[in-house]
Amino acid sequence: MAFEDINIIGSEWIHENGFKILDVEESHALIMAAGYLKHNSLEGVYFRGQSTLYPELRPTLYRGIDSDSAKYNRESRMNSKINEYREVCSAFSKFEDYAAEPLLQHYGLKTTWLDIVDNIWVALWFACYEAKCTRDGHFLHFQKRVVNEVNKYAYIYLIGADLEYRKKSKPGYWHGQSTELVDLRIAAPSYFLRPHAQHGLLFRCKGVEGAGRPLDYSRQIRGVVRIPLEKAFDWLGNGHTVGIHSLFPPAFYDNGYKILLQSGVTFYPRDKEIGVVHTVGA
């Protein structure tokens, strides 16, 4: 049975912005929806929390552009910045090149990868909080969303990623015809703590010969769940295991984060399109 045909107590199917989405009123219904896809899929199914239902699913590096020239320009600048980290951080010699870009994405760089998680409650937290950045992009703060008439829901995307192939030479890396997937808890050293705290994985779509990587990854969306924001806050409660301090461990605890912050790699205003390793207020 297709996901869009399932019937779960405590939920109903609705249409919003061209999507058929599952509107969930009970926490058990949320868990059942997530579990159904994971059990019935031949691919890996993961979660991504969103505050808004967007028509596209773009990685941060590709947002706000539409031309190949702009795409390749950003990719070139991003790769140059990654190489700067490789040159000055000996930690990058402790893992393979395939993990460098997704790791830096996890700490703030804008890349071709998208963050996903395999814990539904972590995804829900990201759907309930919004990130606020200083103008220069260096300092990041998360704040609780305010429930009002235009800000009533949290969304969780269910994302499919290929698991057909993996290599012993690439721990934590899977790929198939459509996507690549990296689990940083395996691919990167454990002193990079944030991926473990967030149950963090990343995926990206593969390109086709002659056209390159697509700007929009929405072809991998397998379902969308909507939760009333007020109920989502109630389900999350006030526990410390899912909160800013635990999901974004300070550099005092996250030695990998400290290495990046102390690397000496600089970011200038012209680097805005490729992001920065943020200092997160926790």
Regions found by a protein language model. Give the residues of each.
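Catalytic-core elements of nucleic-acid end-processing and repair enzymes
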Residues: 1-282
